[in-house]
Design a protein with these regions (language model features):
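Flexible, small-/acidic-enriched active-site or ligand-binding loops
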Residues: 140, 193-224
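Flexible, glycine-rich active-site loops centered on histidine and acidic residues
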Residues: 99-105, 127, 139, 179
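Short glycine/proline-enriched turns and hinge-like loops at secondary-structure junctions
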Residues: 68, 137-139, 163-168, 181-184, ...
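A short, Trp-centered hydrophobic/proline-enriched beta-strand micro-motif
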Residues: 121-129
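Conserved hydrophobic/aromatic beta-strand scaffold that supports enzyme active sites
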Residues: 126, 140-144, 151, 169-173, ...
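A short core secondary-structure module
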Residues: 150-151, 155-199
Length: 390
């Protein structure tokens, strides 16, 4: 990467990126392998990221953000994702899936209560959409929120919720009118310490070992009506809009994963000697490196296009967000695989980071919408069946 050729970035963007890169190299890189092996969630590092103001790029200063915008958010997310897939999730849990949703749809009271606390990491956030039997088909969710005086009574179960075992609050989607299907969905802010909320960690997963993920069981949980986001019954529309934001973050994190794989592979190719010279001299190794670099840069270009559009006010750019998400997340699966070809046997050992990068890269094709769903949105838009940008 050459700084002067990054023509899309302002000097401010470059300074921010350099600052975050230095932070990640100094604070995250030395502990990442140990934290992953020990499945240790680093709350202290989340606090440090908050102290540096990293969560606040798309949030106005008035609510504790810095208003630097979406491209700044993508740059920060990539740099943290490059160092740790587990810590990358913070940019959806503190910002896009929580603070930004509350900023868009919350009452003034709710905004003041939650957004600054998320920005400073005084509160840890999560968002609950997926259920055991309602995943890609979000409108099939069965968690209910039934109005009872000044409160909603919530019953149901959420599955695969990032940070739920450590979270203080949750942006929760539930059915206020089950019969109305997607028109009966609403969004709430739920206090995770409320009576009736139980979060159970899913401990044995393929990757992201330092990132607690869990189920949320809700039994007669009472949420004040003031914690309803926007209007009752409009939750499905809000969910789609929230996903347009969270998918940008996932795509930016995926680029970080790709870049980490590129870095490790280049280093190794130059250091590893076989047949009397570095393997970097062999054309077949160069071919692999070329593909890794090109895939990473292509993914980054799509992420930046999407973020720049949002910075120009085109925040509902579903089409471009989904294209970036599809491409970058596919690359986060493929580029570390290519890295394993370069590192070969040593890459198969946990002595080198490529094994962790490969494991963590797998998740991007699943979360914030599986790859098939991205392809479906791209194709139905292209075929004129359903316009993605509305
Ligand atoms: C580590 C991790 C963290 C997560 N964090 C969160 C979180 O914080 N909050 C949250 O709400 N959710 C979270 N999720 C859930 C995630 O968003 C879902 O896993 C995702 O939406 C897809 O659901 P599924 O994996 O159950 O797949 P399913 O929906 O069961 O689909 C299975 C397969 O069928 C395909 N498929 C489904 N429908 C179609 C169709 N119509 N056409 C073609 N193919 C189709 C899918 O592409 C997929 O390949 C997380 C998941 C993981 C693994």
């Amino acid at each position: 990467m050459s700084d002067e050729y990054d023509v899309e970035l302002t000097e401010e963007h470059k300074m921010l990126r350099d600052m975050v890169r230095k932070f990640a190299e100094k604070e995250i890189a030395p502990v990442v392998e140990k934290d992953e092996k020990e499945h240790r969630f680093q709350r202290e590092l989340v606090n440090k990221m908050a102290e540096l103001g990293l969560f606040g790029c798309p949030i106005p200063e008035e609510y504790g953000g810095n208003g630097m915008g979406y491209l700044a958010h993508a740059l920060v997310t990539e740099e943290i994702g490059r160092a740790s897939g587990s810590l990358r999730v913070a940019f959806n849990m503190q910002t896009m899936g929580t603070a930004l949703s509350i900023f868009k749809w919350g009452s003034e009271e709710i905004k003041k209560k939650y957004i600054p606390a998320l920005m400073s990491a005084e509160m840890i956030g999560c968002f609950g959409i997926t259920e055991p039997d309602a995943a890609s088909d979000t409108a099939a969710m069965t968690t209910t929120a039934i109005k009872d005086g000044n409160e909603y009574v919530v019953n149901g179960r959420k599955m695969w919720i990032t940070w739920s075992p450590v979270a203080d609050m949750c942006v929760l989607f539930a059915m206020t009118d089950k019969k109305a299907k997607h028109k009966g969905m609403s969004a709430f802010v739920m206090d995770m310490r409320s009576p009736g909320v139980t979060a159970i960690e899913i401990k044995d997963k393929l990757g992201l070992w330092a990132c607690p993920t869990g189920e949320i069981i809700m039994e007669d949980v009472r949420i004040p009506t003031g914690n309803l986001l926007g209007e009752e019954g409009k939750g499905f529309g809000y969910l789609m809009q929230e996903l347009i934001s969270t998918r940008l973050t996932a795509a930016a994190g995926a680029v970080g994963t790709c870049q980490a794989a590129v870095d490790e592979s280049i280093k190794y190719a130059n250091e590893r000697n076989q047949f009397g010279q570095p393997i970097a001299q062999y054309q077949m190794v160069q071919e692999v490196i070329a593909r890794m670099v090109a895939e990473t840069e292509a993914a980054r270009a799509l992420v930046w296009r999407c973020a720049i559009q949002k910075d120009r006010g085109l925040v509902n750019n579903m089409r471009e967000t989904v294209i970036a998400k599809y491409y970058a997340c596919k690359a986060a699966d493929e580029v570390p695989n290519l890295g394993l070809e370069v590192l070969s046997a040593y890459g198969y050992s946990n002595e080198y980071p490529i094994a962790r990068i490969l494991r963590d890269g797998k998740v991007y094709k699943i979360l914030e919408g599986a790859t098939n769903i991205m392809k479906m949105i791209i194709a139905t838009d292209a075929l004129g069946i359903k316009k993605a940008n509305r």
